[in-house]
Structures are given as structure tokens and as C-alpha cells.
């Protein structure tokens, strides 16, 4: 962690920096001292202490009251700038891509939408979900870091401006994409095998997914769970890992299981129909579902590691800062302080793993666009759309005829 080397330079430049600066207790830059006896209450307000995690000599006891900066010291500022830039730029692209697919597959252009066409509605719902992720990213782009860091050393909480809204939008979009990915895999199997689904059954599935998504997105507000996490996310999201497991990761695990079954059944159906001239057109959606499966799998592995090792990562950072200051005070011959030897710098979260996580979440909206925009199905939807037929450029039955022939 290169950040810690900058701490060393600060210490050296100030000859070990005293804990008293102009009569005020000071912490090493970029940390900030906060006098408190209620660290738990402060956490609820958004303050994150470095938490040395072990008894300290009196001369160093002030370090337990040092606040972590927002955004956190797990990454250098250049790294955070890269993360923020990725979310802003890629989020805007994903928002636009999702909106285009929503328009084509939604009721504005899709004549089959209100006929409860299973496939087009499923694609629309997935695009709608990634659209909400894009909206949350645009909120971050508009408000910048102030949305997650209302103060230099305080992380946003649900009571802060825009954080609750951003958290709900992100959760709603991300969770929705997960559940509709699962159904997209089942839809692929139905299309590849030629099986049909009762429209009433599909209506029940449609309503159930959206109702469940709404409940799981708004319920965390009852526990004041939305806020800025000091690692993993750039947006506001669910703070406590047990709440994350209950309201997101459990649903993702179930969706991955369904997705895996759907992928296997689709492959099996395609193998059985290798002589069918329509087999190739089912391969592209299968590739999309497989890529989504891999991305969601990476997300759960990454966040699982983060959640399980969060306290460990904090302790590494805290111990390294404590070691540096201990040695600095020892060199100043402060009574009672013993030189602790060379301070080691252990890796916590790599830049590439964090970047990949943020990238994969934003890639969802771009993928649905890339895989469906130029498909034959999309071209038929455009040809049969209200707008195309209004100007005499299309055939209102084009998509339905294709559907009858192949589905």
C-alpha cells in the first residue's frame, strides 16, 4: 500500500510528528483526530476509526481516535480517482445503452409487449434493471464524491442528502438484474427447446420478481442500512454484511444456481437440435447468459472475501500506522517507547480486483445492448414498431410472423 509510504514521509518531514500541534491533538495526515467515547455511535453517523486493535502505550493512545479519510486509505487517491472516473463514464454509457434497449423492447415500440411476449418482456426487464444502476451512477457523477463523503472524514449515511435514494436505486437495479438474469437463462432454454410457457404463469413470475425486488430494496431502509461503504463500492449501498447476505447475496446465489441450470438445459437442447437450421440464433443469447453468470460469480467471490476480511484489512492498516508512529517516537527517545523493528507492509485489496468488480457491474447494461441491438429479433421489432409503420417503413406483423415460425 503505497499510501503508507506517504505517511512515513510525513513523519520524517516532521521528525516523528508530535501528537500535539498548536495545542490540538493531531493524527498523521490524512487521518483526523476526533475526541469521542462512543465509537459505535460515531460509526452510525459515518465516522470510521482506524482501530489499532491492541493495547497502546499512553503516548500512542490517541491513535485509536484517528478517523479514516473518505474515500478510504485502502487505496491511494489516484486509485480512487480511477474508480470514480470508471463509474461516472462507464455508468453514463451503460445508462444510454440500457435506455435504447428499453425503448425498443418496451411498450413504446414493441407491439408484442402487451401480448405478454415472454422473451421481449424479459429482455426489457433486464435492461430496466441496468437502467436503474445507470441512474444511480449518474447521481454520483452529478454530486461527485460529496454524495458518499459529505465531510472529508465522514462517510455518507441514509440520513444524508441523496445517499438513501442512491442506495435504493443501486440495490433495486443490481438485484433486479440478478433475478432477471436467472429468468433470461430459463427463457433461453424455452426458446432453444421450443417449449412454451403459460402466459398466466409468466404473469405470476413477472409480478413476483418485481414485488420481491421492491421489498428487498426498501426493507433495508427500516434498519438504516444504506450508506457509503469504505471499500468495495463507490455508490451508497447496504452497510452491514448480514443485511447484505439477507437482501442481496442470498438472492444472487439462488439466481446463479437457476442460471447454471438454465445454461446446462439450453446447451443440452442445442446439442439435440444440431441439425436444426435455427440452432445458431440461440447461441448468441447463450453466450450472453454465460458471460453474465461469470460476472456475477466474480462479484460474489470478491465481495465475500471483502466482507470476511474487512476487519483484518482494517487491522493491517491500523497496525502499520501504529508501528510507524511507535518507531518515530522511539527515535525521538520518548520515554516508555521501544523501537519495534522494521514495519512490514502487507497487501490488502488489490487495485485490479476492485477495478474489475466496478467494471463488471457497469458492463451489464452495455452487454445487453451489444448482444441484442443488431440481432434479427431487434430489427424485426423495429420494423413492426408503431413508429416504423406510422411512416410506412415497416410491417406491423413482422415480429409476430417470425415468432410463430420459430418459437
Curated annotation (Swiss-Prot):
UniProt entry tagged with the keyword Transferase: no
**What InterPro entries would the database entry show?**
GPCR_Fz/Smo-like (IPR050949)
Q: How does it sit in the membrane?
A: Multi-pass membrane protein
- Chief subcellular location equals membrane
Q: Which domain of life is it from?
A: Eukaryota
Residues assigned to the Extracellular compartment are: 24-89, 142-169, 221-246, 307-354
Specify whether Protein transport is a keyword of the entry: no
Q: Where in the cell is it found?
A: Membrane
Q: Which residues lie on this side of the membrane: Cytoplasmic?
A: 111-120, 191-199, 268-285, 376-407
The entry's keywords: Coiled coil, Glycoprotein, Membrane, Receptor, Signal, Transmembrane, Transmembrane helix
Write the signal peptide boundaries. Answer: 1-23
At which residues is glycosylation annotated? 37, 346
Its Gene Ontology cellular component terms are:
membrane
Q: Where are the membrane-spanning stretches?
A: 90-110, 121-141, 170-190, 200-220, 247-267, 286-306, 355-375
Q: Which PANTHER family match?
A: FRIZZLED_SMOOTHENED-LIKE SANS CRD PROTEIN J, G-PROTEIN-COUPLED RECEPTOR GPCR FAMILY PROTEIN
State the family it belongs to: Belongs to the G-protein coupled receptor Fz/Smo family.
Protein name (Swiss-Prot/TrEMBL): Frizzled/smoothened-like sans CRD protein J
The species this protein belongs to is Dictyostelium discoideum (Social amoeba)
Amino acid at each position: 500500500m503505497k499510501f503508507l509510504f506517504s505517511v512515513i514521509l510525513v513523519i520524517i518531514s516532521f521528525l516523528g510528528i508530535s501528537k500535539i500541534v498548536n495545542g490540538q491533538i493531531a493524527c498523521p495526515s490524512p487521518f483526523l483526530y476526533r475526541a469521542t467515547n462512543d465509537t459505535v455511535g460515531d460509526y452510525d453517523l459515518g465516522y470510521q476509526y482506524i482501530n489499532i486493535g491492541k493495547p497502546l502505550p499512553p503516548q500512542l493512545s490517541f491513535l485509536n481516535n484517528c478517523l479514516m479519510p473518505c474515500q478510504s486509505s485502502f487505496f491511494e487517491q489516484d486509485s480512487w480517482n480511477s474508480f470514480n472516473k470508471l463509474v461516472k463514464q462507464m455508468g453514463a454509457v451503460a445508462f444510454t445503452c440500457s435506455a435504447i434497449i428499453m425503448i425498443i423492447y418496451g411498450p413504446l415500440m414493441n407491439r408484442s409487449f402487451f401480448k405478454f411476449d415472454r422473451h421481449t418482456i424479459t429482455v426489457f426487464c433486464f435492461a430496466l434493471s441496468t437502467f436503474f444502476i445507470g441512474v444511480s451512477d449518474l447521481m454520483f457523477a452529478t454530486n461527485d464524491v460529496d454524495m458518499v463523503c459529505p465531510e472529508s472524514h465522514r462517510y455518507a449515511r441514509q440520513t444524508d442528502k441523496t445517499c438513501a435514494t442512491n442506495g435504493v436505486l443501486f440495490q433495486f437495479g443490481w438485484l433486479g438484474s440478478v433475478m432477471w438474469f436467472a429468468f433470461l437463462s430459463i427463457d433461453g432454454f424455452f426458446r432453444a427447446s421450443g417449449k412454451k410457457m403459460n402466459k398466466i404463469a409468466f404473469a405470476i413470475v413477472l409480478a413476483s420478481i418485481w414485488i420481491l425486488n421492491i421489498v428487498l430494496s426498501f426493507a433495508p431502509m427500516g434498519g438504516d442500512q444504506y450508506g457509503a461503504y469504505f471499500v468495495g463500492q463507490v455508490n451508497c449501498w447496504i452497510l452491514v454484511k448480514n443485511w447484505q447476505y439477507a437482501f442481496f447475496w442470498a438472492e444472487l446465489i439462488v439466481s446463479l444456481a437457476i442460471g447454471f441450470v438454465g445454461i446446462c438445459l439450453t446447451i443440452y437442447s442445442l446439442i439435440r437440435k444440431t441439425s436444426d437450421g435455427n440452432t445458431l440464433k440461440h447461441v448468441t443469447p447463450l453466450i450472453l447468459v454465460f458471460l453474465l453468470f461469470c460476472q456475477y460469480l466474480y462479484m460474489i467471490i470478491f465481495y465475500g472475501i471483502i466482507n470476511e476480511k474487512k476487519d483484518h484489512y482494517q487491522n493491517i492498516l491500523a497496525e502499520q500506522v501504529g508501528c510507524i508512529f511507535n518507531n518515530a517516537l522511539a527515535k525521538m527517545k520518548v520515554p516508555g517507547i521501544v523501537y519495534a523493528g522494521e514495519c512490514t507492509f502487507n497487501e490488502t485489496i488489490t487495485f485490479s480486483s476492485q477495478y474489475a468488480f466496478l467494471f463488471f457491474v457497469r458492463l451489464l447494461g452495455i452487454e445487453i445492448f451489444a448482444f441484442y441491438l443488431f440481432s434479427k429479433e431487434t430489427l424485426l421489432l423495429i420494423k413492426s414498431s408503431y413508429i416504423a409503420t406510422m411512416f410506412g417503413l415497416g410491417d406491423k406483423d413482422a415480429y409476430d410472423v417470425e415468432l410463430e415460425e420459430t418459437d
